[in-house]
From Swiss-Prot:
The gene is Mdk. The record marks 100 as: Required for high affinity binding to PTRZ1 by interacting with the chondroitin sulfate chains of PTRZ1. It comes from the Eukaryota. It comes from Rattus norvegicus (Rat). Disulfide bonds join 34-58, 42-67, 49-71, 81-113, 91-123. Belongs to the pleiotrophin family. SMART domains: PTN. InterPro entries: Midkine_heparin-bd_GF, PTN/MK_C_dom, PTN/MK_C_dom_sf, PTN/MK_diS_sf, PTN/MK_N_dom, PTN/MK_N_dom_sf, PTN_MK_heparin-bd_GF_CS. This is Midkine. Keywords: Developmental protein, Differentiation, Disulfide bond, Growth factor, Heparin-binding, Mitogen, Secreted, Signal.
Length: 140
């Protein structure tokens, strides 16, 4: 009699486990029906950079996924637009800046990115960079 009870209990437990697994597979299939997701920008949880969330929609479905905005990103391009940059050009004496151009390498999450961009930065003298390099190595 005890063997029958044990066998019946084991059979019920096995049935419960297989039912739970089948339900989980159905959930995965329902979520994967959508193939055209539209993703918004990564919005940091605090300040301008760091961990945040990105919202995506597909039909009536909405998802939020974790994402990260690098702290060295340039706001004018967006964190999801990746560019390949040329070398810095010569220093323009009239403006005191040098420039370089970047061409779009990758647009993540269907981001709207410019094909080419131009960035500038102030010119620096060679002596300053050498002094910083020496200071960083512990030589004064």
């Amino acid at each position: 009699m005890q063997h029958r009870s044990f066998f019946l209990l084991a059979l019920v437990a096995l049935l419960a486990v297989t039912t739970a697994v089948a339900k989980k597979k159905d959930k995965v299939k329902k979520g994967s029906e959508c193939s055209e997701w539209t993703w918004g920008p990564c919005t940091p949880s605090s300040k301008d950079c760091g961990m945040g969330f990105r919202e995506g929609t597909c039909g009536a479905q909405t998802q939020r996924i974790h994402c990260k905005v690098p702290c060295n990103w340039k706001k004018e391009f967006g964190a999801d637009c990746k560019y390949k940059f040329e070398s810095w050009g010569a220093c323009d004496g009239s403006t005191g800046t040098k420039a370089r151009q970047g061409t779009l390498k990758k647009a993540r999450y269907n981001a709207q990115c410019q094909e080419t961009i131009r960035v500038t930065k102030p010119c620096t003298s060679k002596t300053k960079s050498k002094a910083k390099a020496k200071k960083g190595k512990g030589k004064d």
